[in-house]
Amino acid sequence: MELGVKVVFIKEKKYVPQLGTFTMFEIPTGNYSKGLGVGKVWYKVPIWLQKNSGHWTLDGGAGYQVVPQTGYRNFPYTGWLVKRTLGSRLELGVELFAHAREGYAAPQTQASTMIDLGGYYHFKHHGEQFLFAYGHSIAGQTENYAYVGLYWTWGSDGKGNSAGVRWTGVNGSELEWQ
């Protein structure tokens, strides 16, 4: 399970991108002794930029992942996303994402750069979405992933809506408060 808090340091203006962090806490839900998960809480600490222009969003930055478990490593990562809003319900994006070695116990023992495609479908009830993504490595260790999920958010999106939604990164869901 993933929980996160978005903190904005500089708000987006006409010629200035938003600057902030989206600190994530990965809560263990699997049985570590059976190879299901890391077995401890681990963290993502990024610095992110975001700029909107009409139906387009550019989003990117870099961060550091802290994984306090034997056999895993702390490592840097970076990513850049281009997203397009198509109507009131659908968002599609393409992302370039790279990470360093994650440790010998992780599936990703070497560095990798991936390209992924994905998006959100927003249901009628605000704050409920269907997420989907597929990614494959283009450099480094071979990686392949597919993701589908249901996503619930709460909080304010700064526009008077009861839930805030932003797609900010790789491999699926994140919670956001603004």
Residue ranges and their predicted role:
Residues 81-178:
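Outer membrane beta-barrel transmembrane domains
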